[in-house]
Curated annotation (Swiss-Prot):
Bias (Polar residues) ranges: 162-184, 277-298
Main localization, broad class: nucleus
Protein name per Swiss-Prot or TrEMBL: Zinc finger and SCAN domain-containing protein 4
Chain positions covered by the region annotation Disordered: 162-199, 272-298, 414-433
Any one GO BP annotation for this protein: telomere maintenance via telomere lengthening
Taxonomic lineage: Eukaryota, Metazoa, Chordata, Craniata, Vertebrata
Encoding gene, per UniProt annotation: ZSCAN4
Domain annotation SCAN box: ranges: 44-126
Subcellular localization, as worded in the UniProt entry: Nucleus; Chromosome, Telomere
C2H2-type ZnF: 312-334, 340-362, 368-390, 396-418
Assigned GO CC terms: chromosome, telomeric region; nucleus
Length: 433
């Protein structure tokens, strides 16, 4: 900010004329401009002074800036609020959105140099609103302000993708209520798979845009000239009057920020005759990884050329999984591998999400409170399970004996009694009552 203000002082002095300082600055440059042959005596003097006086040039520069700012802000006359108002106004004028500086200065003077009155009289006629950027990623698209950080744009669109992925995966299959599809899993959610952990409690940036199912490797950002959005069939960058391509960022360049997002709590498919696990995880985003990305934490689900879903079968049991990360997490249970260890109590877990849930217990925090009885819980899913006591809801139904349960842990405990007598025709997903 200091550099921007310095530029203003050198090129366009503000209302409090800094003639003396600018004159001093011009005089200091005069000898260097007037002498054209060789290195001037003044230049040699400045160079020697810089080399021999232990950063005296830096001190002189700081002192000069101090005099300029002191003369402009006049702290002996102005209060802190007035000084802040001057800085805010100057930054507003050099921020790039002000299109009529003369009008803004006139309104500033007419307001008595009072920021509150100035803001009341200020209209949008004197500024250029931020341009809109049309972003298309993984079949999702939305308009964002050009001032919005790219990281926030990716987070919004990734959440939008994840909000649609569970709905598409669950079409035509009975599923449990959405009360158990959140990131904050409780101690009762012991059967969730790891490797793809994410919060599914998200809000779509633009609910009018549907997922077109295109597996796009890159993030396409198209500049919009504050005009209407393009057709929903895709993003068109052929018309220079409506939009222009501003940037192309590959998904691989963003993998550091995206791979850190976690996925949880979406039902998974099982093989015929197997007991279902309604709280298995599912990837939040459909980012297409390159074939040589061996360090990916979750292999993206993809369809074949004929739309056939690829599946992964466990070699030790008949269970089948949609995603490789689910299979790997499941195989750790067969081997009883618990690589994720709590540093405080040394308890091991099959998946990182279970460890994160467990670590909340050590903090002693219980941020989730029941609205009916004021009882507090450390995890949101525990609160939801508790609330079912008040509502009487039992969303987990046994497909064999039609017995309903409030908690998934009780449901799974009951299902183990049927595990050895499961008929092949029984559906793999429990019905939610």
């Amino acid at each position: 900010m200091a550099l921007d203000l310095r530029t203003i002082f050198q090129c366009e002095p503000s209302e409090n004329n800094l003639g003396s300082e600018n004159s001093e600055f011009r005089q200091s440059q005069g000898p260097a401009v007037q002498r054209e042959e060789g290195i001037s005596e003044f230049s040699r003097m400045v160079l020697n002074s810089f080399q021999d006086s232990n950063n005296s040039y830096a001190r002189q520069e700081l002192q000069r800036l101090y005099r300029i700012f002191h003369s402009w802000l006049q702290p002996e006359k102005h209060s802190k609020d007035e000084i802040i108002s001057l800085l805010v106004l100057e930054q507003f004028m050099i921020g790039g959105h002000c299109n009529d500086k003369a009008s803004v200065k006139e309104k500033w003077k007419s307001s008595g140099k009072n920021l509150e009155r100035f803001m009341e009289d200020l209209t949008d006629d004197s500024i250029n609103p931020p341009a809109l950027v049309h972003v298309h990623m993984q079949g999702q698209e939305a308009l964002f302000s050009e001032d919005m950080p790219l990281k926030d744009v990716i987070v919004h669109l990734t959440k939008q993708v994840s909000a649609q992925t569970p709905r598409e995966a669950n079409m035509g299959t009975p599923s449990q209520t959405s009360q158990d599809t959140s990131l904050e899993t409780g101690e009762g959610c012991e059967d969730e798979q790891d490797g793809c952990n994410s919060s599914l409690k998200t809000t779509q940036v633009n609910e009018n845009i549907t997922n077109q199912g295109n597996q796009i490797v890159s993030l396409i950002i198209i500049q919009e000239e504050n005009g209407p959005r393009s057709e929903e069939g895709g993003v068109s960058s052929d018309n220079p009057n409506n939009s222009k391509r501003a940037e192309l960022v590959t998904a691989r360049s963003q993998e550091g920020s995206i791979n850190g997002i976690t996925f949880q709590g979406v039902p998974m498919e099982m093989g015929a005759g197997c007991i279902s696990q309604p709280e298995q995880s599912s990837p939040e985003s459909a980012l297409t990884h390159q074939s040589n990305e061996g360090n990916s934490t979750c292999e993206v689900h993809q369809k074949g050329s004929h739309g056939v879903r690829k599946s992964y079968k466990c070699e030790e049991c008949p269970k089948v999984f949609k995603y490789l990360c689910h299979l790997l997490a499941h195989q750790r249970r067969h081997r009883n591998e618990r690589p994720f260890v709590c540093p405080e109590c040394q308890k091991g877990f099959f998946q990182i999400s279970d460890l994160r849930v467990h670590q909340i217990i050590h903090t002693g925090k219980k941020p989730f409170t029941c609205s009916m009885c004021e009882k507090s819980f450390s995890h949101k899913t525990n609160l939801r399970s508790h609330e079912r006591i008040h509502t009487g809801e039992k969303p987990y139904t046994c497909p064999f004996c039609k017995t309903s349960y409030r908690q998934s842990s009780t449901y799974h405990r009951h299902m183990r009694t049927h595990e050895k007598i499961t008929p092949p025709s029984v559906p793999s997903t429990p019905e939610a009552s």
